[in-house]
Amino acid sequence: MHFRAITRIVGLLVILFSGTMILPGLVALIYRDGAGRAFTQTFFVALAIGSLLWWPNRRQKGELKSREGFLIVVLFWTVLGSVGSLPFIFSEQPNLSITDAFFESFSGLTTTGATTLVGLDSLPHAILFYRQMLQWFGGMGIIVLAVAILPILGVGGMQLYRAEMPGPLKDNKMRPRIAETAKTLWLIYVLLTVACALALWFAGMPAFDAIGHSFATIAIGGFSTHDASVGYFDSPTINTIIAIFLLISGCNYGLHFSLLSGRSLKVYWRDPEFRMFIGVQLTLVIICTLVLWFHDVYNSALTTLNQAFFQVVSMATTAGFTTDSIARWPLFLPVLLLCSAFIGGCAGSTGGGLKVIRILLLFKQGNRELKRLVHPNAVYSIKLEIGRAHV
């Protein structure tokens, strides 16, 4: 185990992360909300920590193995979550304890969406932007972003990429070089974010909120800039836009890459995981709409459909946005949506949960075992195409 080489890479990653403090710092300058000092302090502290880790080990360049790649990922998320808590600690508003600051930082980076903050509407814009930015970086994975940058600094990225990517997609290289794959993933990620922000802005959401919610939507994180979450805007159009982009982000990014490469939309429907993912969403929307309509929870059929569509997609993709309290819903529905969150999104997406592909493989495995009960000597193989990868 090359511990000094590992320390060098972690130091480089922390130095890169320190540069992200510039963005919320600029927001603080634009809105003059008084939070700029917290990000300035964090920038220098993170830069110092990264430099202390990197400088003594700057000449330690060794070939990374799989176990070292996994260790770097674990160390980096631990260190990054800790450094990411500093703006919450240094900021006068909100006045968080160290424990709450750590919780907020790790919740953002892991796109969990749980929060210790209340009174979001009165917080500085820079702090609100920083929370959304944490989720956005955590959504695709800063490690994947770093893989696109570190080769410039002489660090190989394959083992880091394999350790960071979830599920079967980790062995599917869309480009011959791993750095090119990482850049392609982030290009798609950025394009979706820009498209989502513009759509929300055109739908009537203020520019700051549109950018913030596009970050959390594409990352499937669930943080909002308001205590009432998406319900603050009271707009069926905004609800629909966010739900659509949550579905897009819940898909395998390998499929988005195929479309970007000039292939037709048919590539989506040919993917069995995508078909199951959409099938689950449609089934849940139909069930929720019918039950809500039968119990007269909302005044009109259109409102019922809109609320059902949004809440189903938000819960099933593990985003956690809300537009209304589901405590008003029949108890059967919240339990159903909670179960759907265990499935989550597709492999290679920003969604959480077990991943649809694993549920699909579980069904196929079960079907194979039933066949083997009837024909014990037969040989049955499980074949499944995921985007451009094969299992």
Named regions from a protein language model:
Residues 1-390:
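Membrane-proximal intracellular helices of multi-pass ion channels
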